[in-house]
């Protein structure tokens, strides 16, 4: 089948949407499907390159850091998509490219499915100081989106519940986004662990709490810095891998708390290098409750890293307490779980690491693509039945006329 995936975010940006899109495209192509990406150019110039169509856009960082809005119509490229005649459109974002996705689906008379990646009510502080007003607006806009698509995809039961609470008007399927598990092969674990630890001058005995992700206010990394103040004397290092608009704020916070000597900020790391950082850690930590699914959780597990994360609904089917990690609700629970890990014998830790890696199988990109393939086929068939009914009804009116 021919699949058009639309997204406001694409490489070189680093986030869960980009990871999901790239992995889905790769796996669908391996299964013999034709896949094109429609996204926004980093300039006002529209062009196509290696099956990716870039529509001209302008900076919209005043709305959200790194955001862009389409300005160039790119008529020839748009016409090329219509002539390519996709079988289905899969939109990944709710803004510029969504409206292009809707227009293409209508013109080609094909289904439009949409993945809801973002809990927007956790991001309303970027454009409104009033949380209740922001939540009401998000609910309204989400319902509007749901009226324009044939089906929505929730990466986790957390998002499925949220969408139902919003009162959306279309079917919802829970399909976790997939990752390439081979990137986290155990054969590379020892080499990567030693290389990264040498680079940042950490010895083998140091307990390293690893955070990987974008540094933004909604990620609540400040909480990890506050907890680090309590554990730094016990030979524990907090390693924060990633960049973002909140990096300098976090550096200042670390200085205020007196933890700069036990916190490592790596800054932005290239996507090709991110996988090599996981083995450097002993536990993966996160204080965020704004994740829809949290692909970094899946990546950490795939690398054999148990989780120590703030309790969140998106982790309900992911964390098996005491087996592949822990969820905490308070500082006391965080400190207790960390102490539990440190007091384990080496063979117990290895057992947890092994089980963590095993539990990541549910996030295989092959499983992800297989589920998407089935959904696409079902939506295409339903759209065909709908068209046939419409034609039959029109034919009946002609006869009666």
Language-model regions, residue ranges each:
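Donor nucleotide-sugar binding/catalytic pocket of nucleotide-sugar-dependent glycosyltransferases
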Residues: 39, 53-56, 135, 139-191
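Nucleotide-activated donor-binding/catalytic signature segment of Leloir-type glycosyltransferases, i.e.
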Residues: 249-269
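Short alpha-helical donor nucleotide-sugar binding micro-motif in glycosyltransferases
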Residues: 266-269, 276-281
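Aromatic "clamp/platform" in nucleotide-sugar-dependent glycosyltransferases that forms part
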Residues: 289
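Conserved acidic donor-binding segment of nucleotide-sugar-dependent glycosyltransferases
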Residues: 321-332, 339-346
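N-terminal subdomain of nucleotide-sugar transferases
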Residues: 1-56, 373, 390-401
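A conserved mid-protein helix/loop that constitutes part of the nucleotide-sugar donor-binding site
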Residues: 19, 207-230, 245-251
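Short hydrophobic beta-strand element within catalytic cores of glycosyltransferases
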Residues: 306-309
